[in-house]
C-alpha cells in the first residue's frame, strides 16, 4: 500500500496535526489509544496509508512530532489522543526558537534535525511502498517555519523521488502573532517554492472570518480554527485514505493540479461549514455544496479568487452522492464563471467521490484550487517584508545566528518572481501567437 509519513513541527504544526489525527482516527473507527472498533470494512481497507498496525488490533499513526521546546508536545501527550502516538516519535529540544527563523533553520533546529531524520528514516523503512510525506507547520514562527523548511530540504535530499506535501499556515494581517512574521514567512516561501511539491495554504485571517461570519462564533479560539483546518485536511486526504477513483495518491493530485512546477500553492475550502458543537440538522444537496464550495467566503486563504483565475481545481465529494449530479454541477459552475478559469487548460476541474462522509454529516465537499489570486497573499507578506527590511529592522536577531543579509534579498526576489509568474499566467490568453486557434475557440463558445 502507498503509505504517507506525517510530520508536524512547531506549536502551530503540532496543534493542527493533533486535530487532524483526532479527526481521521474517528473516521477510521479508532479510539483514543488506537484500538479499532469501527463498523465498516472500508475503514480498514486503506488504513495503512496513515497507520501502522501494531500488535493487539492497535493502530499507530505514521507521525513524527517535532518541536524545539517541550510545551506543545506535553499538551498533545496529555490530550485525548495522546496515547495514539508512538513515544519514540516525539523529538524535541529544550531551548525553543523564539519565533526566530534563523534559530530554527541554522542553529537550534540544525542540532536537532538529524535526530528527526533518523526517526523519519525508521518510519519510512516500515513502509511497503512509501508515496511521500506531509508536513503541518506555520510560516510565521521559528520552529515550524525555520526548522520545518530545513526538514523538508533534508528529506528531499534523502528521498528525492517521493512527494512532499505541506499544510502551511500563512501569517495574516489581522491575526499577527509576532512582529517578525513577514521575515519568517518570506524566508519560508523561498524554501517551499524550491522543495515542496504541493502546498495547501491556510490563513488564520480567513479562518477567523469563517468562524465569525459563517459559524457566528463571537470570539473563536485556536481550537475552533484547528477544527476547520482538520476538516479540510481530512477532506483533502480522503482520496488517499479511502478507495476512490480520482486523485488516489499525492502524485496524481499533483499531476492534476500543478501546471508549472513553481506554482504549487493551493487554496482550500470546505462545505458545509459547521461549528464544533453543532452539526447541521438540515440535509444539504449537491448544488448547495457546490455553491458553498466555490464561495469566496468559504476559502481558507485570505485571497479572493475573483481577482484572479483558476489554473486548475479539484473537488472531492463525500457521502451518498450521484456521480451525474456532481458532473452536471461542475459543468454548470464552469460555464457560468468562464472568466474565472484559464481557457488554455480545458477540463481543468477534477472531481472525486468517496462514499464515506465525515462524522456527523450526510455529505460534504472539499475544494482544492490552484488560483492565480493566491499572489495577493504573497504580495501582502512581501510588502510587509519590504517595509521592515528597507530599514533593516530586527535584522540583528537573524544575523546574530549567522545569517547573511544576502539571503533576505534572495528570498524577497524569489517571492516577487513567484508573484509575477502568477500574474503572467493570469494574463495569458489562448490566442497569443496562435491566431488560427482563436477562431475555433470562438465557434465553440457560441454553441
From Swiss-Prot:
Q: Which residues bind GTP?
A: 11, 69, 138, 142-144, 204, 226
Gene Ontology annotations for the cellular component aspect, listed alphabetically = cytoplasm; cytoplasmic microtubule; microtubule; spindle microtubule; tubulin complex
Sequence positions that bind Mg(2+): 69
Q: Which Pfam families match?
A: Tubulin, Tubulin_C
Q: Which domain of life is it from?
A: Eukaryota
List the subcellular locations. Cytoplasm, Cytoskeleton
GO BP annotations of the record are:
microtubule cytoskeleton organization; microtubule depolymerization; microtubule-based process; mitotic cell cycle; mitotic sister chromatid segregation; mitotic spindle disassembly; nuclear migration along microtubule; response to antibiotic
Q: Which cofactor does it need?
A: Mg(2+)
Record's function text: Tubulin is the major constituent of microtubules, a cylinder consisting of laterally associated linear protofilaments composed of alpha- and beta-tubulin heterodimers. Microtubules grow by the addition of GTP-tubulin dimers to the microtubule end, where a stabilizing cap forms. Below the cap, tubulin dimers are in GDP-bound state, owing to GTPase activity of alpha-tubulin.
What's this protein's name? Tubulin beta-1 chain
Which organism does this sequence originate in? Answer: Emericella nidulans (strain FGSC A4 / ATCC 38163 / CBS 112.46 / NRRL 194 / M139)
Q: Which gene encodes it?
A: benA
Amino acid at each position: 500500500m502507498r503509505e504517507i509519513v506525517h510530520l508536524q513541527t512547531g506549536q502551530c504544526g503540532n496543534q493542527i496535526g493533533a486535530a487532524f489525527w483526532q479527526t481521521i482516527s474517528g473516521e477510521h473507527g479508532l479510539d483514543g489509544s488506537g484500538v479499532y472498533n469501527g463498523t465498516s470494512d472500508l475503514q480498514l481497507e486503506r488504513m495503512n496509508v496513515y497507520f501502522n498496525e501494531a500488535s493487539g488490533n492497535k493502530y499507530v499513526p505514521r507521525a513524527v512530532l517535532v518541536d524545539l521546546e517541550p510545551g506543545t508536545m506535553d499538551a498533545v501527550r496529555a490530550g485525548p489522543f495522546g496515547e495514539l502516538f508512538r513515544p519514540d516519535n516525539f523529538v524535541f529540544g529544550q531551548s525553543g526558537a523564539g519565533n526566530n527563523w534563523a534559530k530554527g533553520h541554522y542553529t537550534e533546529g540544525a542540532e536537532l534535525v538529524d535526530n528527526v531524520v533518523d526517526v523519519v528514516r525508521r518510519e519510512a523503512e516500515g513502509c511497503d511502498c512509501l508515496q511521500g510525506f506531509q508536513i503541518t507547520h506555520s510560516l510565521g514562527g521559528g520552529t515550524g517555519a525555520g526548522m520545518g523548511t530545513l526538514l523538508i530540504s533534508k528529506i528531499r535530499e534523502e528521498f528525492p523521488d517521493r512527494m512532499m506535501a505541506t499544510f502551511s499556515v500563512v501569517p495574516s494581517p489581522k491575526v499577527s502573532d509576532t512582529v517578525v512574521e513577514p521575515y519568517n514567512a518570506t524566508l519560508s516561501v523561498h524554501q517551499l517554492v524550491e522543495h515542496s511539491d504541493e502546498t495547501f495554504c491556510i490563513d488564520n485571517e480567513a479562518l477567523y472570518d469563517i468562524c465569525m461570519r459563517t459559524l457566528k462564533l463571537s470570539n473563536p479560539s485556536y481550537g475552533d480554527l484547528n477544527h476547520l483546518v482538520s476538516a479540510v485536511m481530512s477532506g483533502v486526504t480522503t482520496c488517499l485514505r479511502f478507495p476512490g477513483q480520482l486523485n488516489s495518491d499525492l502524485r496524481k493530485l499533483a499531476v492534476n493540479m500543478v501546471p508549472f512546477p513553481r506554482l504549487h500553492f493551493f487554496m482550500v475550502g470546505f462545505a458545509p461549514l459547521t461549528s464544533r458543537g453543532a452539526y447541521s440538522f438540515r440535509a444539504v444537496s449537491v448544488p448547495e455544496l457546490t455553491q458553498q464550495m466555490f464561495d469566496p467566503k468559504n476559502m481558507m486563504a485570505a485571497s479572493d479568487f475573483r481577482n484572479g483565475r483558476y489554473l486548475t481545481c479539484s473537488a472531492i465529494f463525500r457521502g451518498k452522492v450521484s456521480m451525474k449530479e456532481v458532473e452536471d454541477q461542475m459543468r454548470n459552475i464552469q460555464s457560468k464563471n468562464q472568466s474565472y478559469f484559464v481557457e488554455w487548460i480545458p477540463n481543468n476541474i477534477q472531481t472525486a467521490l468517496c462514499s464515506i462522509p465525515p462524522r456527523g454529516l450526510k455529505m460534504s465537499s472539499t475544494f482544492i484550487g490552484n488560483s492565480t489570486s493566491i499572489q495577493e497573499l504573497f504580495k501582502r507578506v512581501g510588502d510587509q517584508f519590504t517595509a521592515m527590511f528597507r530599514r533593516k529592522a530586527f535584522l540583528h536577531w537573524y544575523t546574530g545566528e549567522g545569517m547573511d543579509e544576502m539571503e533576505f534579498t534572495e528570498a524577497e526576489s524569489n517571492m516577487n518572481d513567484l508573484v509575477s509568474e502568477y500574474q503572467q499566467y493570469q494574463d495569458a490568453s489562448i490566442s497569443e501567437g496562435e491566431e488560427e486557434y482563436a477562431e475555433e475557440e470562438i465557434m465553440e463558445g457560441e454553441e
